């Protein structure tokens, strides 16, 4: 049992029965939202979304490894300096200690809607420290604290059809890990559901659609989205450039 900064309540793993109940609730909520969307369209109305991200963000490199409270295997897996995102008031919003070396790619997924076909699902991309509450890609408030960032693809099961432009996500899990490398979808999802009814997630946008002068860097690439772009080395000597959305959201219904 452990605590997250900004909360006085201990975090405990949900029971299997509770997690199944949560998944049933999410299904009901999805069907309710879908019916509402169809009804609205039939009435000739269009949905409108308010752009809430009016801040400007900057990036700086901060020397020093991740928090000492992390397991040694995690601390050794990531860089000994962080990419720090500063908000419009020049205050630190988040620190990101990215993996010093990702596993070599296996079993590329070339399905439409997948921008990062050679990223191994479930792999840890970074350690994140949020300094203050911040909304994720689904506009969910995420509390200050320390998290692991894992790569996960939105399931192609019909339940998320048309929800977002791309299926690639950086999801948050608890700051503990039996494995930092690739792992199955269900295992990663269960870890993410330990934190919230729906996984906290930031979008991974195609890197070639995010133009930046130098890496690592941060830029606004749409009116309401900001992304950190950088290249990460791999064990086989290759590298992969990612663009992780750190501000702004996209949820089509």
Regions found by a protein language model. Name each.
Residues 118, 159-163:
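Short consensus segments that form the blades of beta-propeller domains
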Residues 28-40:
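Bacterial N-terminal signal peptides
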Residues 123-125, 142-144, 165-167:
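Extracytoplasmic
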Residues 110-114, 125-133:
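N-terminal post-signal-peptidase region of extra-cytosolic proteins
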Residues 45-116, 172-253:
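Primarily secretory-pathway and cell-envelope proteins
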